[in-house]
Amino acid sequence: MAVYTDITEDELIRFLAAYEVGSLTSYKGIAEGVENSNFLLHTTRGAYILTLYEKRVNADDLPFFLGLMHHLAQRGLSCPLPLPRADGKLLGTLSGRPAAVISFLEGMWLRKPEAQHCREVGRALALMHQASEGFRLKRPNALSVEGWRPLWRNSEARADEVQAGLKDEIATELAFLEEHWPRALPEGVIHADLFPDNVFFLGDRLSGLIDFYFACNDFLAYDIAICLNSWCFEKDGSYNITKGMALLSGYESVRNLTAEEVEALPLLARGSALRFFLTRLYDWLTTPPGALVVKKDPLEYLTKIRFHRAIVSSAEYGLRREEASA
């Protein structure tokens, strides 16, 4: 979450008049994240999240995102829900941008997740994959392998400003992944951004998943790869196999991976690392000064790309199944 667009109190009061949320008592911007402008609202009826959808979010995708949250909640997954306006619509307009008021989910994200939390995340991810079955809307993953080269072109010329030799290394990496990317694995709706700041806990109990604005249709195992990258590396860049084992066993407590998914996991993890490297690199080079947003270091994901290049078997991630050692 982030803030790119400021709003005035008068604007917000007029906007909230279309919702049954009571009277505004306070609001503040939320700086974490990089995609939309988000505010925590307090009213006489409780707490809510206000989201203004910025230019990277295609307004045509919003019915998919909001509909998915509704679908998942109906099937028992704990996630935020968009509130309807007086006219029944889920979207309004504020400061020239599509905007929605979302229910507030209790809990906090963990700054230092441990293995037990990784197991909970793996299990919740599998439950989300199950709960999304039957959701009829479709959204291709614009940030999968077909989208990486256009994204790379936006940063390629300046890549060596971040680290010498980066331009050539990433060009080689991208070409390899384009050639070897899997073509046939189990598919469904994936979260595609299940980082620690998008998972809430109350104590050690997972209380819900948030921020579905990258959700799309893609390989289910690609979602697992994203989680391995975002949950199982330590700050020094080392991979914590205990966390990896916990996350994978948590996932497989609900849904077992196929042999093809097990074989593809190292490549999916490598591609996932490149995807987040590329978006971080673009934001690092182009985020306007003064934006209330936390820029994230792309080199963190360069370290992960290099780690995954050396992986031979999914067993090295902590997957303890016969197929992983084949």
Curated annotation (Swiss-Prot):
InterPro entries of this UniProt entry? Aminoglycoside_PTrfase (IPR002575), Homoserine_kinase_II (IPR005280), Kinase-like_dom_sf (IPR011009), Pseudomonas-type_ThrB (IPR050249)
- Which keywords does this chain's UniProt record carry? Amino-acid biosynthesis, ATP-binding, Kinase, Nucleotide-binding, Threonine biosynthesis, Transferase
Q: Which reaction does it catalyse?
A: L-homoserine + ATP = O-phospho-L-homoserine + ADP + H(+)
Name the pathway it acts in: Amino-acid biosynthesis; L-threonine biosynthesis; L-threonine from L-aspartate: step 4/5
State whether keyword ATP-binding applies: yes
Q: What is its EC number?
A: 2.7.1.39
> SUPFAM superfamilies given for it?
Protein kinase-like (PK-like)
| A GO BP annotation | threonine biosynthetic process
Q: Which top EC class applies here?
A: transferase
A GO MF label: ATP binding
CDD domains given in the database record: HomoserineK_II
Q: Can you tell me which family this protein belongs to?
A: Belongs to the pseudomonas-type ThrB family.
HAMAP family documented for this protein:
Homoser_kinase_2 (MF_00301)
NCBIfam families from the xrefs?
A: PRK05231.1, thrB_alt
Q: What is this protein called?
A: Homoserine kinase
- UniProt lists the gene as thrB
